[in-house]
UniProtKB/Swiss-Prot annotation:
Mode of membrane association: Multi-pass membrane protein
Name under which the protein is recorded: Respiratory supercomplex factor 1, mitochondrial
UniProt record, GO biological process: mitochondrial respirasome assembly
Region (Disordered), start-end ranges: 136-157
Organism listed in the record: Aspergillus clavatus (strain ATCC 1007 / CBS 513.65 / DSM 816 / NCTC 3887 / NRRL 1 / QM 1276 / 107)
Task of the protein: Cytochrome c oxidase subunit which plays a role in assembly of respiratory supercomplexes.
A Pfam family annotated for this UniProt entry: HIG_1_N
Family: Belongs to the RCF1 family.
Sequence intervals crossing the membrane: 33-49, 69-86
């Protein structure tokens, strides 16, 4: 691969980004093309051995089984050599994936904390409104006095005064005396 220096911040390097499974397959295929080549050679040797067996050609079948063994050996060597060659890059990729997971977890935690703060603020606002309403109700209960009743009584029109009745008038007189 390229001999680029190790990036100081993996997020700034476009080489390290989140990828889909198809992108990952393509990238791995480009990084280590010998492994799929070895797998294809092994499959082809097995196919040819099968055809030779069906045809009854034991000499060709034995050659193809040997070719399969050589192809598998080639694939194994490609895997080991590729693993050694791309070791540092894989470590960087693992570190990057850990950082991405940590970033996602941190974003999720931050969103959760923001939601808790909003709920806490709403709760405090509700408690303040509730306390203010209770205080206003207590204040209104303390302020209820005779002048207020007289003010309410004066709002009644003179034509409606006659319909108050004797019982209400007696209660009003008793309330004024107390």
């Amino acid at each position: 691969m390229d001999q680029e220096p190790i990036p100081s911040s993996l997020e700034d390097n476009p080489q390290f980004k989140e990828e889909t499974s198809l992108q990952k397959f393509r990238r791995r295929f480009k990084e280590e093309p010998l492994i799929p080549l070895g797998c294809a050679a092994t499959s082809y040797a097995l196919y040819r051995a099968y055809r030779s067996m069906k045809a009854g050609d034991s000499v060709e079948m034995n050659k193809m089984f040997r070719a399969r063994i050589y192809a598998q050996f080639f694939t194994l060597i490609a895997v080991v050599a590729g693993g050694m060659y791309f070791k540092t890059e894989r470590q960087q990729r693992r570190e990057f994936e850990k950082m991405v997971e940590q970033r996602k977890a941190q974003e999720k935690r931050d969103a959760w904390l923001r939601e808790l703060e909003v709920r806490d603020k709403e709760d405090k606002d509700w408690r303040e409104r509730h306390a203010a309403m209770e205080a206003a109700a207590k204040e209104a209960g303390k302020r209820k006095s005779v002048p207020e009743q007289d003010a309410a009584r004066s709002a009644i029109e003179p034509a409606d005064e006659k319909s108050i009745g004797v019982l209400a008038a007696v209660r009003e007189l008793l309330a004024r005396q107390n």
